[in-house]
C-alpha cells in the first residue's frame, strides 16, 4: 500500500525535515506573546517533499486545478461539542458519562447559546486576531453542540486555518475548565 514505507504499526513514524512556510506565520492570539508557523515535510534522505503529507497532496491538487483554469476556494462550517468539564476532571472520574455544556437542542434559538458565549466568543476573537476570519457562530442541534463558520478562501489556506482553529478552540476551552471535541459522534445518542 503506498505510503506505508513512511509509517506503519511496525515502523512507527520516521523522522522528517520540516521546512517552514513563512506564508503561514501568524499570531497565535489565544496564547500570550506567541506566533505559529506551519511547515512542509521533506525526506531526510534526499530533501524531497513527502508526497503523502496531507498538505502536499492538497497542494498538488490545487496546482492541477489551476492548470485547468480553476481557483479552488472553500468555506468551512466546523461543528464541535462543548463539555462542561475538562478532560482532567473526566479522567478523575474514569471517563464516565461526558457532561455537555447544554442539555437541549439549541439550533435555531436566538438566546440559548448565550450561556456558552464566554468560550465561543473567546474562540471567535482569537481566530479573528490570528488572521482566521470568522463569518458566524451558533448553537447547534445536539446538547452542547456549536458551530463556528470560517470565511471562504483558497483551499490550502483554509486547511491551514483548520489546523489553527482546532488547536485554538481546544486550548481556549481547556483554559476555561471545559472540554471540546470535534468527534462527529462522541456519544451513541448524539450526532
Regions found by a protein language model. Give the residues of each.
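Glycine-rich, acidic/polar active-site loops that bind/position phosphate-bearing ligands
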Residues: 1-191
Amino acid at each position: 500500500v503506498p505510503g506505508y514505507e513512511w509509517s506503519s504499526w511496525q515502523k512507527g513514524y520516521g523522522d522528517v525535515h520540516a521546512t517552514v512556510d513563512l506564508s503561514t506565520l501568524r499570531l497565535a492570539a489565544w496564547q500570550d506573546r506567541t506566533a505559529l508557523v506551519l511547515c512542509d515535510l521533506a525526506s531526510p534522505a534526499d530533501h524531497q517533499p513527502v508526497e503523502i503529507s496531507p498538505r502536499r497532496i492538497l497542494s498538488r491538487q490545487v496546482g492541477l486545478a489551476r492548470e485547468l483554469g480553476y481557483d479552488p476556494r472553500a468555506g468551512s462550517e466546523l461543528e464541535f461539542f462543548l463539555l462542561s468539564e475538562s478532560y482532567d476532571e473526566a479522567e478523575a472520574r474514569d471517563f464516565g458519562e461526558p457532561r455537555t455544556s447544554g442539555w437541549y437542542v439549541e439550533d435555531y434559538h436566538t438566546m440559548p447559546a448565550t450561556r456558552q458565549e464566554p468560550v465561543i466568543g473567546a474562540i471567535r476573537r482569537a481566530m479573528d486576531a490570528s488572521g482566521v476570519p470568522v463569518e458566524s457562530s451558533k448553537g447547534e442541534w445536539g446538547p452542547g453542540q456549536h458551530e463556528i463558520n470560517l470565511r471562504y478562501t483558497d483551499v490550502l489556506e483554509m486547511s491551514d486555518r483548520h489546523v489553527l482553529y482546532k488547536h485554538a478552540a481546544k486550548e481556549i476551552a481547556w483554559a476555561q475548565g471545559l472540554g471540546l471535541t470535534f468527534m462527529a459522534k462522541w456519544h451513541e445518542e448524539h450526532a
